[in-house]
Amino acid sequence: MSGIPLEANYLVIGGGAMGMAFTDMLMTGTESTVIMVDRHHQPGGHWNDAYPFVRLHQPSSFYGVNSKKLGSDTIDATGWNKGLYELATNGEVCAYFDQVMQQQFLPSGRVQYFPMCEYRGDQHFGSLVSDAEYDVVATKIVDATYMHVTVPSMRPPPYEVAEGATCVPLNALPRLAGQWDRYVVVGAGKTGMDACLFLLKNGVAPDQIGWVMPRHAWLFDRADIQGGQMFARTLGRWGGETFDAIAESESVDEFFANLSGRGLLLRLDESVQPTMWRCATVTQAELVQLRKINTIIRSGHVQRIEANSIVLDQGTAPTSPTTLHIDCTADGLEKRPATPVFAGRDITLQSLRMCQQVFSAAFIGHIESAYDGEALKNELCMPVPHPDTPLDYLRTVVGNLLNAARWAQDAELQAWLRHSRLDFLNAPDAGGEVDEELAQRLAVAAVAKLQRWLAEVDA
């Protein structure tokens, strides 16, 4: 059955942060028309499904779309983020993207937005709430869903929950907290940390909390990811000190020891070597709080939660019917294989810089708007896949440096980067000069050493 015919220059599949950031560049850099299709009722993607107390894990100042500021560049005066730039709440992020859609995209007359709709392939999509079906004629098809973002509320837990046991996604925590003798957080990533911090912040004693931690993670210090008046520290930590750590190391293990010694990477337990790295950020104050939790369950992944026992890969742990188990095991951003960003009519949005998906989507939008030729556009948009293990840290640093070296050869692109609010490594108002020649020499040496280490590991 044929659907209602539609036509536009671009069909953008997904109205999350990456789809919005890409489309924003088309709106500001071209006269193109766009059809945007999304399963949610409003823009923002997974932010619509996220737990109510979630905040950005990076400053608001370099999140969102390039054309509209998020937040007010306020430095938090209280709380565990004290002294650092503000982190937007879930509600603020959803409202922000809705404003971009309602106040910028739709009034332009160049965007048609179809919420509560599902793309079915072959330039066809349909409504999730009615019988409406649509056929699209579009010059380009943009996949803004390739990163497969998943949060706990989007699916049941990946383990069995027996009768007599209670397990909920952490979305339910504000509603259910206070009704239980104990809490067990399942999942060692940033979502699990947020659940623990929520409980601690609201007065739950550390000895009432258990934490299932199949893998320990390396963490970024959020103080090292700041713009504005703190940008000099950010640049020094991500540039000079990281180069120094590489230069002073003769092996992968020594490199991570040097990163840890400099505080460039943090960990929950100094006695445990992390086997996970997913870009999670934490403040020193948050780390102090998390370390108060002593019941850490390190017996692998949960297989089944019973009324009085948690069955794991390598053993069991006691629980009870009066314990609330909090599922924090969703993958978040998957580690996806790199694929060409530009392939004929298809554009696949991916990260081009370590853990900076929204900046990357805007960058791809700029390249699509300002450059011609598929080969050149792909040369400028080499994916840096989202990480999962510590070795991926090496791979992403190499990807970052190779991309930065290529971008540095293009004066017009450098000018765009300097004025992009989403590029936290090019704070436009920070001032200061960078010795580009020295930085290039250090980067070349760093890439050579990191690639040698990776080759040795893969051999």
Predicted regions and their residues:
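N-terminal Rossmann-like FAD-binding beta1-loop-alpha1 element of flavoenzymes
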Residues: 5-36, 183-202
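Glycine-enriched catalytic-core subsegment of oxygenase/oxidase enzymes
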Residues: 197, 296-299, 303-436
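Extreme N-terminal leader/targeting segments of oxidoreductases
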Residues: 1-10, 28-32, 147-175, 448, ...
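Glycine-rich active-site loop/strand segments that organize a redox cofactor
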Residues: 39-96, 170, 212-269
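Feature captures the FAD/FMN-dependent oxidoreductase FAD-binding
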Residues: 77-151, 269-272, 279, 286-312, ...
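Dinucleotide-binding/catalytic capping subdomain of oxidoreductase cores
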Residues: 200-306, 350-362
